[in-house]
Amino acid sequence: LSSTISSDLSGAPFGNVVSYSDGVPGESHGIPYFYLTTLDPTARDALEDERTSFTLSEFPLGTCGKVDPENPTCAKLTLTGKLKVVDHKSPEAALAKAALFSKHPEMEGWPKNHHFEIFKLEIENIFLIDWFGGPKPISPSQYLDYGRDQGSVMFL
């Protein structure tokens, strides 16, 4: 779930389920990339105000067992930061496109006249709930270093 400051709703928060990837299989790095069009509010909002949060749940991985997905023991990760367009001529754009299209192959066939662009979340803060007792303190560098060493679970 990506949440932005809505330009269409007078600055109200707006949450939207969006496809993402943080690397090609086996080479995840933790930085989420998105393939968005300004026909969608998420891209429009980010171009007006880059502040964004992106929330993931452990539940789709199947590791929560039969626990209610909203139970604190089923981890939830929220990344906050700036959602920015990736320069389409940069090496990062090629990496992001490979990551997105390997996870979501149908993206390659999306309508060209919708002018999809690659965005990335520049992570500034991390909020992790994986048990009772409040969020766990994790810095962006700890998160990204762990993702580089272990392969991020975001891609799974």
Residue spans for each PLM region:
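Short, structured beta-strand-loop surface elements
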Residues: 10-12, 39-103, 116
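Short glycine-enriched loop/turn motifs at secondary-structure junctions
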Residues: 27-30, 77, 112
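C-terminal edge-of-domain segments
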Residues: 92-156
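Conserved hydrophobic/aromatic beta-strand scaffold that supports enzyme active sites
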Residues: 1, 15-19, 76-80, 118-120
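Short hydrophobic-aromatic micro-motifs
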Residues: 32-36, 79, 119-121, 127-128
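An N-terminal domain-cap segment
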Residues: 1-47
